[in-house]
């Protein structure tokens, strides 16, 4: 079965059982994005470097057996109407906004607390 066809629950089990690293999973999503980005154009904001940095941090925490959140190391995409301090949020507007918000929406706070890696914002 293809990696990106697995459910979040299946991916989390593979991460927990150390059959997969967060870096490997994020690289699979990056590869998928690069393959289809030109035609799909569904990504408003994408920071590959930050994503891989967060994934590496998650993998290192897993190796050190630190207390892990329920979504630890799982890449999660956000809709562009959800405010996040890590990425510009356009709230669906067609204007180009370069500035990031200072605040995270409550759902973003909860995702981060659970250990998720923010993948990108989608249109």
Residue ranges and their predicted role:
Residues 58-74:
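Immediate post-signal peptide segment of exported/extracytoplasmic ligand-binding proteins
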Residues 1-50:
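An N-terminal boundary/leader segment
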Residues 70-110, 114:
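Enzymes and membrane/adaptor proteins characterized by extended Gly/Ser/Thr/Asp/Glu-rich
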Residues 34-39, 64, 83-89:
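Secretory-pathway/luminal and periplasmic proteins that interact with or process carbohydrate-rich
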Residues 51-56, 112-116:
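Long amphipathic alpha-helix in the N-terminal Rossmann-like dinucleotide-binding domain
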Residues 23, 52, 105-108:
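Non-membrane alpha-helical structural segments and their capping/turn regions in soluble enzymes
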Residues 120-123:
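Conserved small/polar residues in nucleotide/adenosyl-binding loops
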Residues 8, 62, 104-105:
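Generic non-transmembrane alpha-helix signal with a bias for helix starts/N-cap capping motifs
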């Amino acid at each position: 079965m293809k990696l990106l066809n697995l459910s979040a629950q299946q991916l989390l089990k593979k991460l927990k059982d150390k059959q997969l690293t967060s870096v490997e999973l994020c690289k699979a999503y990056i590869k998928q994005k690069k393959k289809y980005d030109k035609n799909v154009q569904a990504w408003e904001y994408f920071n590959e470097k930050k994503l891989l940095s967060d994934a590496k941090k998650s993998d290192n925490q897993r190796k050190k057996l630190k207390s892990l959140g329920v979504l630890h190391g799982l890449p999660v995409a956000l809709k562009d109407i959800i405010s996040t301090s890590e990425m510009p949020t356009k709230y669906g507007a067609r204007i180009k906004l370069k500035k990031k918000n200072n605040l995270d929406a409550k759902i973003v706070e909860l995702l981060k607390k659970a250990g998720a890696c923010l993948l990108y914002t989608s249109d």
